[in-house]
Amino acid sequence: MIPIVIEESGRGERAFDIYSRLLRERIIFLGEPVTSDSANRIVAQMLFLEAEDPEKDIYLYINSPGGSVYDGLGIFDTMQHVKPDVQTVCVGLAASMGAFLLCAGAMGKRSSLQHSRIMIHQPLGGARGQASDIRIQADEILFLKDRLNRVLADRTGQPLERIQEDTDRDFFMSPAEAVGYGLVDSVIDKRPVHSVN
């Protein structure tokens, strides 16, 4: 069930679902696995906010266990494509593709709340069918693994070899460790400068 917010004005009351109300403040919330539905919604929201005001930052709050690599890359590419900076904030858990998107925020504008957890690892996948089909899927997973590792190395400043080693298995970090690693830029315990009216 999505909470409803009632807003009063001189013209009466108006009801909004909470996510629509947050969107008015340029806040997007990823609080679920990354799927085609969640990715399409987030991409559409970013494009809408860019069209509304290309100079004002967009805030992406992330509490996600990860999900589809392809859909996550669609969000990532849109974050890099839109003119406004996208500030990212981890609330709770940013794991797998969630951590990748957290790291994809504008440099200097990536943060985590103090009790959150961040986890990186290699992409997961599986294949069935004929040997040639399994080989095609295995090659694609290896391609994606290399692509994600190279982006993480670029965005964190870590050597590619370290990223490859650390993503071989689940690699959990505290917010302070994620700052040292280069995944985020700061740990916050108070609301960033913007505020919801």
Curated annotation (Swiss-Prot):
Keyword tags: Cytoplasm, Hydrolase, Protease, Serine protease
A Gene Ontology cellular-component term: endopeptidase Clp complex
The UniProt record lists the keyword Protease: yes
Disulphide bridges: none
GO biological process: protein quality control for misfolded or incompletely synthesized proteins
Catalytic residue positions: 96, 121
CDD domains in UniProt: S14_ClpP_2
Cross-referenced Gene3D superfamilies: 2-enoyl-CoA Hydratase, Chain A, domain 1
EC number from the UniProt entry: 3.4.21.92
Reactions catalysed, as given in the entry: Hydrolysis of proteins to small peptides in the presence of ATP and magnesium. alpha-casein is the usual test substrate. In the absence of ATP, only oligopeptides shorter than five residues are hydrolyzed (such as succinyl-Leu-Tyr-|-NHMec, and Leu-Tyr-Leu-|-Tyr-Trp, in which cleavage of the -Tyr-|-Leu- and -Tyr-|-Trp bonds also occurs)
InterPro entries noted in UniProt: ClpP, ClpP/crotonase-like_dom_sf, ClpP/TepA, ClpP_Ser_AS
The protein's assembly and partners: Fourteen ClpP subunits assemble into 2 heptameric rings which stack back to back to give a disk-like structure with a central cavity, resembling the structure of eukaryotic proteasomes.
Protein role: Cleaves peptides in various proteins in a process that requires ATP hydrolysis. Has a chymotrypsin-like activity. Plays a major role in the degradation of misfolded proteins.
Entry similarity comment: Belongs to the peptidase S14 family.
Name of the protein in question: ATP-dependent Clp protease proteolytic subunit 3
UniProt organism field: Prochlorococcus marinus (strain MIT 9313)
